[in-house]
C-alpha cells in the first residue's frame, strides 16, 4: 500500500499539467493551464515552500524539464503558445534566459538530455516535428534544428535514452505520436542528422507518451508507452546496436492512459489515465513488471464492467 507523505497546495489557478522533481528531489517545478510555471523547495521532512512563480507563456504550459545540476539551475517549459522557454537561476533569482518559437503548433513536451550528451534538449509538437536545442560552449549560444515529418497528426512526447560514460556512445531518444507509432531516433554525429532508427506499431490509437528507462540493466534498454487505447506496452532490447526490440503488453486498462514515467533508479513505473488514478508498477528480481496492489479497486471494477 502506498501513502501520501505530503500534499502541496500549488495555488495554480487552473488545471496542473505536469510536476517534476529535480535530481536531488529538493526542488519541484509545476505548470498548468494558468500559463504559469512554479518552483517549490521540498524539505526532507516533506514540507514545501513556494520559491518563484514564472510567467512568460501565452497559453497553457504542458511540460517542464530540469537540466542536470552540473549546468546550474536550468528549467525548460513547453506550451500551447508554440514556445519553449529556458529559465535560469542566477544568484538565487530565476529569469528567462532563452525563448524558442519555431514550432508551428502547440509544443507538447520538452526533455533535457542526460548530461553525458552535453547541454541539449528535445521538444515535440503538434505540428509533427521534433526540435533539438544544443548549447554551444564556445559561442555561448543555443543552436536549434528541427526534425521534419516525425509523426503524422502530431508528436506527443519525447524521452532520451540513458547517457553513457563511453565518449563513442550514440545519442538516441524515443517519441510517441498520433499516428499510433513509437519511434526510436538516432543521431548521426558526422552528418549531425537525426534519423528514425525504428518505428514500432503496438497501439490502436494515439500514443500519448513513451518513456525511456533512465538506467540499463546489463546493457538491456527498456521503454514503456501508453495510449488512448488503454494499452501499456513494454519494449526491451538486449543489445541496442545489434538486437531487435521486443514488445510485451503489460496491461490493457479500461480507460485511456496519458502518462507513464520511470523512477530515477528505473525499478518503479507510474502510470496515469482517464480514471484519475495513478498505478504503480515494480520490477522484480526476475525482470518482470508487477503492479503494486492497492486498496482502491476502482480500476479493476471498471474493467469488470466493460
UniProtKB/Swiss-Prot annotation:
Q: Where in the cell is it found?
A: Cytoplasmic vesicle, COPII-coated vesicle membrane; Endoplasmic reticulum membrane; Nucleus, Nuclear pore complex; Lysosome membrane
- Has the keyword Endoplasmic reticulum been applied to this entry? yes
Q: Which domain of life is it from?
A: Eukaryota
A Gene Ontology cellular component where this protein is annotated is: nuclear pore
- GO annotation, biological process: COPII-coated vesicle budding; mRNA transport; positive regulation of division septum assembly; positive regulation of TOR signaling; protein exit from endoplasmic reticulum; protein import into nucleus
Q: Which InterPro entries match?
A: Sec13/Seh1_fam, WD40/YVTN_repeat-like_dom_sf, WD40_repeat_dom_sf, WD40_rpt
List residue spans for each WD repeat.
11-50, 56-97, 102-143, 150-195, 202-245, 252-291
Alphabetized UniProt keyword annotations? Cytoplasmic vesicle, Endoplasmic reticulum, ER-Golgi transport, Lysosome, Membrane, mRNA transport, Nuclear pore complex, Nucleus, Protein transport, Repeat, Translocation, Transport, WD repeat
Q: How does the protein's chain sit in the membrane according to the entry?
A: Peripheral membrane protein
Task: List the SMART domains hit by this protein, alphabetically.
Answer: WD40
| A GO molecular-function descriptor | structural molecule activity
Q: What is its main location?
A: membrane
The record describes the protein's role as: Functions as a component of the nuclear pore complex (NPC) and the COPII coat. As a component of the GATOR complex may function in the amino acid-sensing branch of the TORC1 signaling pathway.
State the family named in the UniProt similarity comment for this chain: Belongs to the WD repeat SEC13 family.
Subunit structure, interactors included: Probably part of the GATOR complex.
Q: What is this protein called?
A: Protein SEC13 homolog
**Which species does this protein come from?**
Caenorhabditis briggsae
